[in-house]
Amino acid sequence: MMVTTRSELLDVVYHFYPRGVRCTERSNVPPNGSFYDDTEEHRRLVEAANRGRAEYPTWKAMIRRLGDRYGLQNESLHLLAGGGDPAYSARIWLTDETALSFHVSLLGPYYGIHLPGIPEEEPVAREIAREIEATYPGYRPIPAELGNEVVPDVAMDTVLMGEATIYMCLFSVVWTWVDPE
């Protein structure tokens, strides 16, 4: 198995997110200033989301298989509506009040499973990992010590400069929706 490095992940982030450009309305950008939506990086992010829409049936089949066994909520419907999400995302309910989320990046061969920190999560997480790796050969998880690292010079639609993590950039702000207990 290939080892995922910080440098590799930052290269992917910077390929899809412009450094030092705030994500704001065009009317708030000074004349001759950089506008986020006009950058080459943003264009590549939109292209990745377009590929994600085209390849959505693969994701849908995988989450249908998981949904046959677990209470599953697809968090990727925004992508189908034209959103620029960087990953497919879903949530599996472990209890009435606790869920884990998982994400398959559209920006590189990575996935993440965000665990809430309860005993019931381990067998479910293993099954999700097996399903992702069978559906998306070559994809690998991002270790928490790398994924939680803040990318100081990147902003996202709903995340201010200096607050986005590698996980958020490669998966989605949906990553933050599961809080460990």
Residue spans of the language-model regions?
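Acidic, proline/glycine-rich low-complexity IDRs
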Residues: 136-181
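Extended, charge-biased low-complexity segments
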Residues: 2-136, 140-141
